[in-house]
Amino acid sequence: MNTLQYYISCFTSMNCNKYRGQVAPHKAMMLIAVMDEIYNGYLTNGFVPHNDGMVKAFESAWRRYVGKSSVFNPVFATPFFHLSSEPFWKLMKSDSYVEKKEYSLGALRESFYGAKLPDDLCQYMAEPASRQRLKRALLDKFVPNWNDNENKWMVAESEIEYKSSDKKNSFRMVA
């Protein structure tokens, strides 16, 4: 079993694109979305789907922490695919897998069933104190001004609540 510190180190040393002097926050927002989905009970076995619920969770994390960016756009398929270069994110190839350098959401869904995370990482993401440390490490590294956003969002779990009628598509953010 890897330690929490190992995953914090993996998260903070991720290989991310840089543009105009800024590090792309896409991978960090994807991981925060995964943590939110684990916290809310929508991901339970380490399998990360690329369904509409996951897309909405990613977009919600982006709005919450990145806000409007003049440099980056919240494109879901990019971090979902490129996280496969990290030691903890394994893409699960489908029978219709086609190798590409970049994937649109449709092509991603056609070529991969989803992604798989190690069990120990999922345990850390599910445990409140560990999840808090993982989130904080991601935000401090990849969204250094996250605490200056106009909404002053905090990492605390109680601030965000997802309501879902089918655990898949219908989410609303409650502040």
What is each PLM-predicted segment?
Residues M1-A175:
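Intrinsically disordered, charged low-complexity linkers and terminal tails
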